[in-house]
Amino acid sequence: MARIAGVDIPNDKRVVISLTYVYGIGLSTSKKILAAAGISEDIRVKDLTPDQEDAIRREVDAIKVEGDLRREVNLNIKRLMEIGSYRGIRHRRGLPVRGQNTKNNARTRKGKAVAIAGKKK
């Protein structure tokens, strides 16, 4: 298994798919990395030469991934909460942030439904 950005990527998959195991690298970013490194998308990870692995590592190091990216996202959310913006308030209350309705749905954000005593007829 090749190790890129602190993540073991699978050997038997194509490189373009294996790179998506790194947090912050999706399919389009993976394709851009391979194009910049001059490596075919169809090659398997186990068939990569050490030089090709190093080229991929150099390209990935230029992108914010894994811990740095997670930290930045968390700091952005924390900043929104501190300045008291609408989005920050929604984060603090555990409600949907992007304008979704909450009358009937939003169970994922709100958690399990809590029964109200004395509601039966």
Curated annotation (Swiss-Prot):
Name the UniProt record assigns to this protein: Small ribosomal subunit protein uS13
Designated gene of the protein: rpsM
A single MF term (Gene Ontology): tRNA binding
Spans annotated as Disordered: 96-121
Similarity-based family: Belongs to the universal ribosomal protein uS13 family.
Provenance organism: Streptococcus agalactiae serotype V (strain ATCC BAA-611 / 2603 V/R)
Role description: Located at the top of the head of the 30S subunit, it contacts several helices of the 16S rRNA. In the 70S ribosome it contacts the 23S rRNA (bridge B1a) and protein L5 of the 50S subunit (bridge B1b), connecting the 2 subunits; these bridges are implicated in subunit movement. Contacts the tRNAs in the A and P-sites.
GO biological process, one term: translation
Gene Ontology CC annotations of this record: cytosol; small ribosomal subunit
